[in-house]
Amino acid sequence: AYGTQYFNSNLYDSSHWPTVAAADKYSADFVVNNYLAAGLKPSQMNLGIGFYGRVPKRAVEPGIDWTKADAQNNPVTQPYFGPQQIALFASLGYDLSKDTYVKYNDIVGKLLNDPQKRFTEHWDDEAKVPWLSVQSAEGKPLFALSYENPRSVAIKADYIKAKGLAGAMFWEYGADDQNQLARQLAESLGIKH
């Protein structure tokens, strides 16, 4: 929901992320509640779940005001990637100047299972979403990528049921890793597969 600044797929907003990066208040829950308030029935709405992650646009483009007080206190509010991080993604086959989309199967195969362990996995318990960091040239963690995993998919499925939504849709099946996300979604929604 944040897309260019923070998480690509947050279910809820998170107080862990400061306002310095000009992020907005959007989350899946915010959008669903606004549609419901506008009169859309829950039975008319599906929740979209991406079987991919995104490097935030903020990571590859300058533009954050680093003079603000909370700018240096959080991995998400760092300067954009330097040559080291751009080269790291390029070595894995990603030209971040063209696209910041990373399929879930590549997140698992190339990032989470990186033999050099250059990525660290995190979980934001307020936003209900996983994210990865990489090290800066100074050794500080830099927010690198947000994505869905089986845990976040199960939580979103519970949300769908609790809100009485029509169901879920996802993009894209071919990006899944050995059907982990599709299987989790089906199981959590009570769909036999």
Where would I find each of the regions flagged by the language model?
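Substrate-binding surface in catalytic domains of secreted glycosidases
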Residues: 1-98
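Generic alpha-helical secondary structure signal
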Residues: 16, 39, 84, 98, ...
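Short, flexible coil/linker elements and helix-boundary hinge sites characteristic
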Residues: 73-75, 93, 99-100, 114, ...
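Membrane-proximal ectodomain caps of single-pass cell-surface receptors
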Residues: 92, 103-110
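Extracellular low-complexity, Gly/Ser/Thr-rich intrinsically disordered linkers
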Residues: 111-193
